[in-house]
Amino acid sequence: GYDRAEILRRLRFVSPSSSFRAGYSYSNFGLTEGAVAAAKPTGKPWEEVAEEKLYRPLGMASTSSRHSDFIKHANRAELHAKIDGAWAAKVQRYPDAQAPAGGVSSTARDLSQWMRLVLGNGAYAGKTLIKADALDQTHIPLMVRGKNPVSGGEAFYGLGWNVEFGRHGPIWGHAGAFSAGARSLVMLFPEEKLGIVVIANAFPTGVPEGLSDSFADLVFDGTLGKDKVKAWNDIYAGMFGPVIAAAKATYAAPPSPASPAAPASAYAGRYFNDFFGDAIVSGEGDALVLKVGPAAARSYSLKHFDRDLFLTFPDAEMPDRPSAVSFAVGPDGKASAVTIDFLNDNHLGTLQRVGD
């Protein structure tokens, strides 16, 4: 719920996953920080610079980095996530804070013009929009990523691009997703001046990778090989299905006998850390409620599991996946800290009590 400036300020509290350019970690706000820095000398926001320098010169009239522009289109795709085995449009996503990395709305036609720019080494319709040597720097393999799990090609990361060397030659590409229900993928073959982009309003799905790999097989081999859509769908199912199943199994039933919770007053209070700010725990009726974000905007009901451990279900796109919220209760009978598992990916999910 925080705005872009506040999120970027708080990134200082996240420990780097590697030394500079020694490893790759997917980071929408890392890329956003770079975009903000690039736009700063112009005195204009990134959204305006992107429109002036990129979208407008390429004739991308249906492309914007503003969510408000996307909403204005009557003909737009709603995000879909698989819930109880069926695709459903349940979640609204407001990505403006990370617009440079994950907030662009577009069409297949518009994105084809962008691919022409990249494959043209920064030139489009006879005009140079990006210097070729600057664009070349982004395609240099800098970090090793291993092998592509389907094609077996050697995979690396450059500056905002996956760089792969497979049986069809060098490939520049990238994929992205929102678990709320969005997928995107681009795959470029620079030696053939050929590319494909796939945008999908669904998650999780390996269809974008499967389609692009099948496209490459048809172009280079004249025939389809193995079912690439199934191969990639299986990979995505393996990435997320077991995680959900493990969480459900862990908390399928409390231990027997379960220890009762302390009185609500033991847990109620205000908790804080530098990264997430305030979290408020309060008793509402017979239940505890956790509120986080600016002005305590997001609220999560807590269901008792065992002693000082509670469960909540924070994901609208995975409503049956439980997540733990645990309290550290001291000799005085008061919780001194709370650990919120769904905020703990960077080991920053523990907040200390700072008030009642």
Regions found by a protein language model. Name each.
Residues 174, 184-201, 337-340:
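Short, well-ordered beta-strand elements
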Residues 60, 120, 124, 201-205, ...:
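Short, well-ordered loop/turn and helix-capping segments at boundaries between secondary-structure elements
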Residues 119, 168, 177-179, 201-204, ...:
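Short, glycine-/Ser/Thr-/acidic-enriched flexible segments
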